[in-house]
Curated annotation (Swiss-Prot):
InterPro entries: ARM-type_fold, Rap/Ran-GAP_sf, Rap/Ran_GAP_dom, RGPA/RALGAPB_N, Tuberin/Ral-act_asu. GO terms for cellular component: cytoplasm; cytosol; nucleus; plasma membrane. Residues 1634-1842 form the Rap-GAP domain. Pfam families: RALGAPB_N (PF20412), Rap_GAP (PF02145). The modification Phosphothreonine is found at T715. The keyword Chaperone does not apply. This is Ral GTPase-activating protein subunit alpha-2. Component of the heterodimeric RalGAP2 complex with RALGAPB. Heterodimerization is required for activity. The gene is Ralgapa2. Abundantly expressed in testis, pancreas, lung, thymus, brown fat, and white fat. The modification Phosphoserine is found at S373, S376, S379, S486, S696, S819, S820, S1592. Keywords: Cytoplasm, GTPase activation, Phosphoprotein. The lineage of its organism: Eukaryota, Metazoa, Chordata, Craniata, Vertebrata. It comes from the Eukaryota. GO terms for molecular function: GTPase activator activity; protein heterodimerization activity.
């Protein structure tokens, strides 16, 4: 309609506007042009100058248009003209407020506005009228009349009529009042609609809400549009309107609006539970919407949203965003009406990132389309930013307004569930105020203001306090506004009263208290479980409130009153929400949804509060009362356990100086250290974000305070050992704390972390608290420590900011910590203390340089309180993860600078708040007390009604105890492994739960699962090493509980105790422990007699096996009850022994579990040794041997192998066995022979390798028995009933041994009548031995594949090789055994000692043709040496050496000796031979007699009769004497009749006289014939020759003559020997292979490391530096073997040096089959680093370690760093001179005996049992090596290679020539 004019046209337009001659329409057009082109300041001056003409122009045009509209109707041009006129009207009201204030054109303007406000107008005109009316009313302010006030009160339809002096008023009656006098002639004209509503116009469903929004919006945006000369009047205008609104509308919107809300003097009454309202369902747009029947609820929501708009971040839009396609026909201020105003688009902070719609009050499309805008009431146009900020400032400008806003927000918390989305918006406002930008009223007031307020003591709220007496707060609206409304009366009614009290600073604490109190209403509304959507809304709102609560807990500094209010509110909420539902079958979904979050918040708040302020005992009692009444909630137990985990981590750090996430023992793992070095510490919080369940939003690092302190303990009833209430203030730590007897005897008294000089007297319920007490240098001296002193916490992360994402919040918000005033004040204190901390800061962890640095703001991802708070099913993370998250909430608020105080200063000056001091934050006393109190916060856990939850609590107690035990294990650990730290001063209370546990065992059977957990923990608690011995009261209670458990009828209880109470309990030697021995035996027997699959059978037999030595040690063991099979037993070892061994015997034959069966057999073996060592002669020894012997033929080879090991162990006790019964050692050998014969047929053809290997084990065991038994025992005839019947002449045992060996070599099918040839099992039957004792089967364990194909290379080739060797294994072993017996039986040990088994002589020794000292090629050129192969299995060297001297009657120096060197699979042997018969002095030997040889060993043994062999008379029969001598020296050559070889055999018993006479006649006839033939020849001259004389003796000169002579005597040159006797090719390759063969061992070798650990040694250096041990240790080492001088030792060295660098001596043990060298750490030098390194190399490389530990703590494998040490056998000396054995092995190592993990043995048995166990362990380790070969297998392979490659095939003639004279022409330089 109007176009823009240039600047030159402004003056012309001004003249035309003021020209009265122009018509009013023209003047209006020019005036509009001026409005568009002139600045506001110039316009105001223009309007003030020409106000009368301007109003005239407006009014005339308005009247004209009004008449035109009535006549012509509504069309577009007229509507546009109306817009222009109203635009002018608006400008008049805006530019002339001062005149309007004085009622300028009062009636005219009022009449015009009434026409616009007429209810018959269109919505657009009515909205415009409201806007212009509010402008006029703001200008009039207090000069308005009652009518204007009443019109304002009626602008929003739907409210009740306003009471006035005229009576009830509505907008209609105010616009067209009925005439007061019916007959009056003069009355106002009737006001009609200016622009009536057209049909089809969109009308809001809820017009009350719509017009209320319009009114509220225009109250704001019109407030600053009046151009007052005095700008302050803008504020006054809004305040005037707002006062009217509060007076007329507020009582209806908020009937319960109270004037008592006052954040300056808050009323903090805790709200009560409210019943749920009745909800009405409405379906709108196919969506169900819920509402209530509460009047004006929708309007109430609109008003609250309007208030919220001023305090949330608003979305400002530019003007162009509100135009549509450039159509801007209405004034901008009209266009912003926006019908969708209800749909506020406030950015949601707690939703999913999208806007939240209030679906209950949607009023879309209420205006014409062109008036719709994209904005909402929360989306404000940019030009209105200032006015919204102005109103916000006004609402926070006075105390009255501040209280009013907080009361409105309180009302929002009271909304029903269907409107709770508005409550969440209010929560967002508080969140912003509390956590981000504090409003002015939350700033701290000045001190003088505070003092003034305290003096004033105002009684009423300052919210309209002066209206309190005159205004009614009921539903009826009344007005006391008179017709002459004056400024004074307005002031008296609160319009401007607030100006008197503009000091709005109330401080944050009061605001927080009010918020806490009001926000509780969200929880205290009865949830609507019937409507899931409403329930979900309430849950979300509750969680949003809890998030703020938790942020307050974590991030804000609160005073004691605020903390107490928070705790009381949380208690009230928890009690109300979590109360049991009346109907137990109905689930309380609301409580379930909040349970975990609420419980966690409550407990954490309690912890944080106690770190910051003093919390009274009454509050603690309430806390205990509430939580102990809610133990039926599983979520409570879950959160309690999680928080206890975190508190335990803090306890570990602050009291014990241990980080649970970085334990010293974990750090000792090299692999973990590498991993940690690769990580950056800055990423640690991310782990919490990913998997954490902590609710922390704090970024502070853990304080590193580890200084122990003295302090009070917790005060929580129901916890085990809780202290009595103390009414006196705790004395300072510099004073000596005195303990009164009255305190110490109370069951509730317990100070479990005390550093003092004397031990505190304790009762039975508190004696379990473990502690160490060290005396100070003087009484009362301040405790100080040189280590673990913390300076300050690293703050580099604490002040960081990060993105925090909540599940309730869809957006990401950047949180930044800002220093509070308290922080700034603390900085000064810190600077003063800086000097004291400087010394510590130099040695503290990184980050201590940021003690007070709050400027580091690196952005970090921060773990939320709970990334998955709404998912209670998520599993609890591992310790490390939980601790990493828990570190946040366990820190203090940002002002927690007191943690920076040195603990030493704490001791001297103060203590924590919880202990009565002033220190805030985590300190040793606060950590311990809070840990204690939170532990007991569930009350007596045995009062929990739910068995499931009871079991869960006790299950967690076990986990918690395990953490405490882990802390204990990590105290005083050497991190560098170079030195051992001193013992810790404080240790965790590992017996703290005892009273709970003891009581739990007495509960009814429905609590069975919890009882089992209690028993499990009791066993774990009492099988640990006890740092402090329990007192007698505790032990009595403990023994009673254990007795009742062990004698319980419940099998599960028995199983639990037996499974968890290891033999370590017996090793502890607690006073009176032996009284439980009988109970344990009985209980173990009952466990073993059950058929339950889950029964702890192995553990039961381990317990029984550990007790086998006890009856002999404790001569009379008291029993608490009689044992079965023995009546009325009270004491006595024999009865216990008999009962125990019967159980072992039974289970050694019937036990179905493989491992348990092995343990039973080992236990029997240990017991047999014990009885033999003690010479007890127990009759059941034979029964035990019977069981072991029968087990040898058991199908399960693992079990059978254990029995074989036990038999091999008994070899060393053969003399004791012989003393026990003479025939028993022979019986052992017989058992082995018969078992081999029994198993051989099946093993030969078995495809299972273990079958063959077991036969090998039996053969080697038989060999050991043969070598140990005396020859007389082996030659003793086998006496059995069967043999006596079949064979009257019984063969000796040795014969049967050779027979079975022959069967092994040649095959079991060699003899058809095997039973007649070898011993059978039936032959063993006797009264003492039953070879057919029945054995129950066992469940075979699956064979473990230890090696992959990648480890073995070509698996196919390996398997083929293993198969080939397996076939040959039994024959090869049997050949070795026979060779060993032939060579060593009766000879071993030789005079050189057991270290020398095979010959050290080679072909170069005593060889006159060789000059070198080593075997070299020169040897092969010797004419006196020849090498042969015999039977393709043995190498034989014949060497002729010079004679050493005269032997018998030989001529001195004329003869030589013959040396035979034999190499076979069993070893290398050398025999020297001398000529026994030869020429005497001057005489030859008789005709036809060849020289013979006497064979002796290398050491030239000679026998007595041999010396006189040639000194007899001439007529003596020398042959007769020779035969006699052979029978004397080699009794094995005697005939079975035992007659001497020179004695005639007896007459055959079956020959009669006639037969004898016939034989004599035949012999005589033959003799006569021979004589006749001789005579006939003598008489015949043809056969007569000349007689020849005896030739003279010739001395042999050939260098190989005597060797050839011996070969000839042995028959080696004969044709029948030719195929088995060959020469060897002499060449360099043969030389190398001979050297290699000679370097191989001829016995099984083992090297064992032995360590000694003294008390207090836990590091490598200390252990390796030990040069001697205790006497018991030295005796043990001496019993392992015998000391050998390494410089001269000829046996196995195990890598030790002869030069003394590895020690001078070492223990050495050997039999004819085994050599063991012990690398003893105390025998090796440790005088230098190089020596230590060499010592560690030798000891560490051994596969088996023996550790003798006298330390008070268990040995850790990692102390000696090595990749070897597959098996560690640790010996712990006990108080009763017995020894507890633990065996740790890698999992792939198979079972071995005779000792087992948990065995307890006496000192007499220890060395032999340890030695045997080490040998078996070494064998078990070696069997894992692929293709491992025993020594004889290796020798056999080498011999086979030599024979195949170097055997020379030649004709007999060539062979004879080489034998006659070894040819020197054979080249050894390079021939093959």
């Amino acid at each position: 309609m109007f176009s823009r004019r240039s600047h030159g046209d402004v003056k012309k337009s001004t003249q035309k506007v003021l020209d009265p001659k122009k018509d009013v329409l023209t003047r209006l057009k020019h005036l509009r042009a001026l409005l568009d082109n002139v600045d506001a300041s110039d316009l105001k001056q223009f309007f003030e100058t020409n106000y009368s003409q301007i109003y005239f122009i407006f009014y005339e045009n308005f009247i004209t248009l009004e008449n035109s509209l009535k006549l012509k109707g509504n069309n577009k041009s007229q509507r546009e003209e109306l817009d222009s006129i109203l635009f002018l009207f608006e400008k008049i009201l805006q530019f002339l407020p001062e005149r309007i204030f004085f009622r300028w054109h009062y009636q005219s303007i009022g009449s015009t506005l009434k026409k616009l406000l007429h209810t018959g107008n269109s919505i657009k005109i009515r909205c415009e009228g409201i806007r212009l009316f509010l402008l006029w009313l703001q200008a009039l302010q207090t000069n308005c009349a009652e009518e204007q006030v009443l019109i304002f009160a009626c602008l929003v339809p739907g409210f009740p009529a306003v009471l006035s002096s005229r009576g009830p008023c509505t907008l209609e009656t105010l616009i067209n009042p009925s005439p007061s006098i019916v007959d009056a002639k003069i009355y106002p004209e009737e006001i009609t609609p200016l622009l009536p509503a057209i049909s089809g116009e969109k009308i809001a469903e809820d017009q009350t809400c719509f017009f209320l929004q319009i009114l509220l919006k225009y109250m704001v945006i019109q407030a600053a549009s009046l151009e007052w000369k005095n700008k302050e009047n803008q504020d006054t205008g809004f305040k005037f309107l707002f006062t009217l609104f509060r007076k007329y509308y507020l009582p209806h919107l908020f009937p319960s609006f109270t004037k008592l809300t006052n954040i300056y003097k808050p009323v903090l009454e805790i709200p009560h539970l409210r019943p749920k309202p009745v909800y009405v369902t409405v379906t709108r747009d196919n969506e169900t919407i819920y509402s209530t029947k509460i009047p004006y609820m929708a309007a109430r929501v609109v008003f609250i949203k309007w208030i919220v708009t001023f305090f949330l971040e608003k979305k400002y839009l530019t003007a162009t965003q509100n135009t549509k396609n450039g159509v801007d026909v209405l004034p901008k201020i009209i266009q912003t009406v926006g019908g969708g105003a209800i749909q506020e688009k406030v950015p949601e902070l707690d939703g999913a990132g999208s806007t939240e719609q209030d679906k209950s009050h949607s009023n879309s499309s209420t205006l014409s389309d062109r008036r719709l805008s994209n904005s909402s009431l929360c989306s404000i146009e940019e030009e209105h930013r200032t006015v919204y900020e102005m109103v916000q400032r006004i609402l926070l400008s006075t105390r009255g307004y501040v209280n009013f806003v907080n009361e409105v927000f309180r009302q929002a918390f009271l909304l029903p569930s269907c409107e709770i989305s508005v409550t969440r918006k209010v929560v967002q406002v508080y969140r912003k105020w509390i956590l981000q930008n504090k409003p002015v009223f939350m700033e701290e007031p000045d001190k003088k203001d505070v003092a003034q307020e305290d003096a004033d003591k105002l009684g009423l709220s300052e919210t309209d306090s002066k209206e309190a007496s005159s205004e009614s707060s009921g539903h009826k609206r009344s007005s006391s506004w008179g017709r002459t409304y004056s400024f004074t009366s307005a002031m008296s009614r609160g319009c401007v009263t607030e100006e008197d009290n503009t000091n709005v600073k109330a401080g944050a604490q009061a605001m927080l208290q009010v918020f806490l109190t009001n926000a509780a209403n969200v929880f205290l509304l009865e949830p609507c479980a019937e409507v899931p959507m409403l329930l979900r809304e309430q849950v979300d709102a509750s969680k949003a409130v809890l998030i703020i609560f938790r942020r307050m807990i974590m991030e804000l500094t609160m005073n004691q009153k605020t903390w107490e209010q928070m705790l009381q509110i949380l208690l009230r909420i928890t009690e109300a929400v979590m109360q049991k539902p009346k109907d137990k079958h109905v689930k309380d979904l609301f409580a379930q949804s909040l349970a975990g979050l609420l419980f966690r918040t409550l407990i954490v708040a309690w912890i944080r509060a106690n770190l910051c302020v003093y919390i009274s005992r009454e509050l603690w009692d309430d806390f205990l009362r509430v939580l102990s009444s809610l133990t039926e909630w599983e979520e409570l137990i879950t959160e309690w356990s999680n928080i206890m985990d975190s508190l335990t981590a803090v306890l570990a750090r602050t009291v014990y100086g241990v980080e649970m996430t970085n334990l010293p023992l974990d750090k000792l793992s090299e692999q973990k250290e590498k991993k940690q070095r690769g990580k950056g510490c800055i990423l640690e919080p991310q782990k919490g974000t990913a998997v954490g369940r902590s609710f922390s939003l704090s970024w502070r690092s853990h304080p590193d305070v580890t200084e122990p302190m003295r302090f009070r303990s917790a005060t929580t009833s129901g916890a085990p050992g809780v202290e009595k209430a103390r009414n006196t203030v705790r004395q300072k730590a510099t004073e000596v704390e005195e303990f009164q007897q009255a305190e110490s005897t109370a069951a509730a008294d317990c100070d479990y972390l005390v550093v003092g000089q004397q031990q505190v007297p304790r009762s039975s319920s508190t004696s379990d608290i473990t502690e160490r007490l060290y005396s100070d240098s003087s009484q009362g001296q301040k405790v100080e420590h040189s280590q673990n002193l913390s300076s300050s916490e690293p703050k580099s992360v604490q002040e960081s900011k990060g993105h925090v994402t909540h599940e309730h919040e869809g957006i990401t918000m950047l949180v930044r910590r800002s220093s509070s005033p308290a922080e700034l004040e603390l900085k000064d204190d810190l600077q003063q203390a800086h000097g004291r901390c400087r010394q510590r800061q130099t040695s503290e962890s990184t980050g201590s340089d940021t003690v007070v640095g709050y400027s580091n703001e690196a952005e970090l991802p921060v773990s939320p309180w709970q990334a998955c708070e709404e998912d209670p099913d998520l599993s609890t993370p591992t310790d490390a993860v939980a601790d990493s998250d828990a570190r946040h909430w366990l820190q203090l608020s940002p002002t927690d600078a007191s943690n920076l105080t040195d603990s030493r200063e704490c001791l001297a000056d103060d203590c924590s708040i919880i202990a009565g001091g002033n220190l805030t934050g985590w300190h040793p006393d606060s950590a311990a007390v809070l840990w204690r109190r939170v532990l007991g916060i569930l009350g007596d856990v045995n009062n929990i009604q739910s068995p499931k939850i009871h079991a869960k609590v006790f299950g967690y107690l076990y986990e918690l105890w395990y953490k405490l035990a882990k802390i204990r294990d990590n105290l005083a650990i050497s991190l560098d492994n170079q030195s051992s730290p001193s013992p810790p001063l404080l240790i965790p209370p590992l017996r703290m739960f005892a009273s709970w546990l003891f009581k739990a065992t007495t509960l009814p059977n429905e609590y069975k699962e919890g009882k089992l957990q209690a028993y499990k923990l009791i066993c774990a608690m009492m099988t640990r090493r006890q740092d402090v011995l329990p007192n007698s009261d505790f032990l009595v209670h403990f023994y009673l509980v254990m007795h009742l458990g062990l004698t319980s009828e419940d099998q599960d209880v028995l199983n639990t105790i037996i499974k968890n109470c290891s033999p370590r309990f017996f090793s502890l030697g607690l006073p009176g422990f032996s009284m439980l021995v009988g109970d344990f035996i009985t209980a173990a027997a009952r466990v073993l007699s059950t058929d339950m699959l889950a029964a702890p059978r192995s553990e039961a037999l381990t317990l029984l096996g550990s007790l086998v030595c006890f009856p002999n040690t404790y001569q009379e063991i008291p029993l608490l009850q009689s044992v079965p099979e023995v009546s009325d037993v009270v004491t006595g070892a024999e009865d216990v022994k008999h009962y125990l061994i019967n159980i072992l015997l039974k289970n050694a034959t019937e036990e179905p579990n493989e491992c348990a069966r092995c343990i039973a057999i080992c236990s029997l073996g240990v017991w047999i040794c014990e009885e033999l060592a003690q010479s007890a002669s127990h009759p059941q020894v034979k029964d035990a041997i019977n069981v072991i012997g029968v087990t040898l033929k058991f199908p399960n080879k693992i079990v059978a192998q254990v029995a074989c090991d036990v038999l091999q162990l008994l070899v060393s006790y053969w003399e004791k066995l012989q003393m026990f019964e003479t025939a028993l050692p022979r019986k052992m050998a017989e058992i082995l022979v018969a078992t081999i014969a029994f198993l051989l047929p099946s093993a030969e053809y078995s495809s299972v390798e273990t079958d063959k290997k077991f036969i090998v084990s039996l053969l080697l065991c038989l060999l050991d028995w043969c070598m140990a038994l005396p020859v007389s025992a082996l030659l003793h005839p086998v006496s059995t009933a069967v043999l006596e019947e079949l064979h009257p002449s019984r063969a000796p045992l040795l014969d049967y041994i050779y027979r079975v060996l022959h069967c092994c070599v040649c095959g079991s099918s060699t003899y058809t009548q095997q039973s007649h040839y070898t011993l059978t099992l039936a032959d063993l039957s006797s009264t003492d031995y039953d070879p057919f004792l029945p054995l129950a089967n066992v469940r075979n364990s699956e064979p473990i594949q230890y090696h992959s194909s990648a480890d073995l290379g070509n698996l196919l080739t390996v398997e083929e090789e293993k198969k080939r060797r397996s076939v040959e294994l039994i024959p090869l072993t049997a050949r070795m055994v026979m060779a060993h017996l032939v060579n060593h039986l009766g000879h071993y040990p030789l005079s050189g000692g057991p270290a020398v088994l095979h010959s050290l002589v080679s072909e170069n020794h005593d060889n006159a043709h060789v000059e070198g000292t080593e075997l070299s090629s020169e040897v092969f050129r010797s004419p006196n040496l020849q090498l042969f192969v015999f039977n393709d299995s043995t190498l034989i060297s014949y060497l002729q050496t010079p004679a050493e001297g005269p032997a018998g009657g030989t001529s001195g120096g004329s003869l030589s000796d013959v040396r035979v060197i034999v190499r076979d699979i069993s070893g290398k042997y050398s025999w020297d031979g001398k000529v026994l018969y030869g020429p005497l002095e001057g005489r030859l030997a008789p005709n036809g007699r060849n020289p013979s040889f006497q064979i002796s060993g290398w050491h030239h043994h000679t026998c007595g009769p041999q010396k006189d062999l040639f000194n007899g008379e001439e007529g003596d029969d020398v042959l007769d004497k020779l035969l006699e001598n052979i029978g004397h020296t080699s009794p094995e050559c005697l005939l079975p009749s035992q007659l001497n070889l020179n004695e005639p055999s007896p007459t055959p018993c079956a020959m009669n006289w006639d037969q004898e006479k016939a034989i004599m006649e035949v012999i005589l006839r033959q003799s006569a014939q021979e004589d006749e033939y001789v005579q006939r020849c003598n008489s015949d001259s043809s056969v007569t020759v000349t007689s020849q004389g005896q030739p003279s003796p010739v001395e042999p000169r050939g260098p190989f003559y005597f060797c050839r002579l011996l070969l000839d005597d042995l028959g080696m040159n004969s044709w029948d020997r030719r195929k088995n006797f060959h020469l060897l090719k002499k060449n360099s390759k043969l030389l190398r292979e001979l050297k290699n063969l000679d370097s191989r061992q001829c016995r099984e070798t083992h090297k064992i490391a032995v360590f000694y650990i003294a008390e207090g040694q836990e590091d490598k250096c200390s252990i390796l530096a030990n040069e001697r041990g205790s006497q018991a240790y030295e005796d043990f080492v001496a019993g392992l073997g015998w000391e050998v001088d390494l410089s001269t030792h000829c046996g196995f060295m195990g890598g030790l040096q002869r030069n003394g660098s590895t020690g001078q001596t070492a223990p050495y043990y050997a039999t004819s089959t085994v050599e063991v060298i012990f690398h003893v750490s105390t025998r090796m030098p440790s005088d230098s680093d190089d020596s230590l390194t060499k010592k560690l190399r030798h000891l560490g490389n051994d596969e088996v370690h023996i550790v003798w530990s006298e330390h008070s703590r268990d040995y850790r494998r990692g102390i000696i760093p090595t990749a070897f040490g597959d098996v560690s056998i640790i010996i712990y000396p006990m108080k009763n001179h017995m020894f507890f054995i633990t065996i740790t092995k890698k999992p792939e190592v198979p079972f071995f005996g005779p000792l087992f993990d948990g065995a307890i043995v006496s000192g007499k048995l220890l060395p032999s049992l340890i030695c045997a166990t080490c040998i078996n362990a070494s064998r078990a380790v070696k069997c894992l090596i692929p293709l491992y070969q025993s020594f004889y297998e290796e020798r056999a392979l080498y011999l086979e290679a030599i024979i195949q490659n170097h055997r020379e095939v030649m004709t007999f003639e060539d062979f004879a020539a080489q034998v006659f004279s070894p040819s020197p022409s054979y080249s050894v330089s390079g021939t093959d």
